[in-house]
Structures are given as C-alpha cells and as structure tokens.
C-alpha cells in the first residue's frame, strides 16, 4: 500500500496539476477510513487463507462479495433484494459449497482457509458498499485516502505477524513494487474509475477475470489442478457471482 502512494501522487499531478488530494465533503475522509479498515481486514484474512487453502478456492470465494454487498445494503440502507438476487445468491453458494466439498478441505484440515475466505468476502463487501456511497467523489481521491488509511491499519497485522518487516532481497522488492503498481495503483484505481461508466454485464464479466485468471495461473504455477467436479462447481459459483454483480449494478 505504501509503495502505491508515489504512483498516486504522480497521477494526481498529471491529471489535476497538483499534489494535494482535495475532497468535496469532509465526511469522505471518515468513510474512506471505514472502508480501509474493512479492506485491510479482507486482505489480511485473504492472504492468510492462501497458506491454508488453494488459490482458486480463495479467489472464487472472496469474489462472492457482491452477495454480501446486497445483503448489507438491505440491512443498513433498506435497498430491496430482488428475486433475481435470491437466485444468484443460491447459485453462488451452491457452487461454493460444492467447490469446498469436492476439494476435500473438510478432511485435510484446510476448511479453516475457506471459512476465512468467506469472512474476507464479507469485509470486502463492506468495503465495496462504503465506497459506493462515495460515488460523487473523485475516484482518484477515494483510492488515495483508502490506500493511505490501509497503510496505517496494516501496521496492526504486520506487528502481530512479526518477523522481517523489510524485504531482504531485490526480488522481494520487485514483487512488492509490482503489486503496488499493478494491483493497488492500477487495479483498484481503474475498477473504481470504470465501474460506473460501463454496463453492468460488462463490469461483471470484466471482474470475473480475477478468479478465472487466478485459477488458471494456480494450475500452471502451483500445480493446483482442479477435478472435473471442482471445475463444474467453480463455474456454477462464477455464474452466480456474475448474476449477483449484474443485479448489484442495476
């Protein structure tokens, strides 16, 4: 997160001809901090879960967050849950439960990883819901302040984890810089900027590239080959997530 800040400053200087990030409403700072707390919790649980469960399980389960966005929107903002959402909810979690069951994670002690992913999906849903309420704010301002507060909140899990907090090799530094540039600066900024400018189906299909890409790369890099039944339930889950995102963006 910290390494992404210089890129954001440079982009702000390029687009707005200034270094200062000026918000339209003072409440934006508070909501950015709240969103950052949820996002930091999501990332902490998600990264920890990948040491326990598979990359494909972790990514697909965490991407069920639109379901939590809709449920939380109903609870806190009385946003109606449509019949199509209920269908997407059922399809998504039939797929997820099937994926977990046929991964045999409940037998080999990896079920905890899948449970952590579900909790992470909830917190990512909180993050998305809060960010959605900042729709009138400039997307670059939102990303800057959420990134800044994530830096602060990340100190807590970092201190708990302990160990060497500074990268010890140029390879580790390169990985961190690429993550900062590609994931936080590039990914989060363009998602926030583009999500309201393209159609709901287009946004849903685009965001589904994350779990699909992660599953393919996990098979290539980590030899996490899915069985036929796992692939079937993964596709069912992705279809449910696709429907949920269409419902969420309408």
Residue ranges and their predicted role:
Residues 2-7, 61-75, 90-91, 149-153, ...:
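Alpha-helical transmembrane segments of compact multi-pass small-molecule transporters, enriched
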Residues 1-41, 68, 123-127, 144-162, ...:
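Transmembrane alpha-helices of multi-pass small-molecule transport proteins
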Residues 13-56, 62, 98, 180-198:
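Specific transmembrane alpha-helical segments of multi-pass solute transporters/efflux pumps
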Residues 23-28, 101-123, 159-178, 225-234:
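Juxtamembrane helix-entry segments on the extracytoplasmic side of multipass membrane proteins
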Residues 58-64, 131-151, 184-220:
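Helix-helix packing/entry segments at the starts of transmembrane helices
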Residues 8, 72, 81-103, 120-121, ...:
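Hydrophobic transmembrane alpha-helices of multi-pass small-molecule transport proteins
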Residues 49, 61, 75-77, 81, ...:
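Hydrophobic/aromatic residues within transmembrane alpha-helices
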Residues 36, 40, 44, 67-71, ...:
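Hydrophobic/small/kink-forming positions within alpha-helical transmembrane segments
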């Amino acid at each position: 997160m910290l390494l992404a800040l210089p890129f954001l400053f440079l982009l702000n200087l390029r687009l707005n001809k200034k270094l200062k990030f000026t918000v339209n409403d003072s409440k934006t700072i508070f909501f950015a901090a709240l969103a950052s707390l949820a996002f930091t919790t999501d990332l902490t649980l998600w990264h920890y879960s990948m040491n326990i469960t598979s990359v494909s399980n972790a990514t697909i389960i965490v991407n069920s967050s639109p379901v939590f966005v809709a449920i939380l929107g109903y609870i806190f903002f009385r946003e109606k849950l449509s019949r199509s959402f209920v269908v997407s909810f059922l399809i998504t979690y039939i797929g997820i439960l099937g994926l977990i069951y046929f991964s045999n994670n409940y037998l080999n002690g990896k079920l905890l990883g899948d449970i952590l992913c579900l909790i992470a999906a909830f917190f990512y849903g909180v993050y998305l819901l809060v960010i959605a309420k900042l729709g009138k704010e400039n997307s670059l301002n939102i990303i800057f302040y959420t990134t800044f507060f994530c830096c602060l909140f990340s100190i807590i899990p970092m201190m708990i984890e302990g160990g060497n907090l500074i990268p010890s090799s140029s390879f580790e530094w390169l990985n961190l810089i690429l993550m900062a540039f590609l994931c936080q600066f590039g990914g989060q900024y363009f998602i926030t900027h583009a999500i309201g400018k393209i159609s709901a189906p287009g946004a849903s299909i685009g965001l589904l590239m994350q779990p699909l890409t992660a599953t393919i790369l996990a098979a290539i890099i980590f030899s996490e080959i899915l069985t036929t039944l796992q692939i079937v339930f993964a596709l069912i889950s992705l279809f449910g997530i696709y429907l949920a995102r269409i419902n969420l963006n309408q």
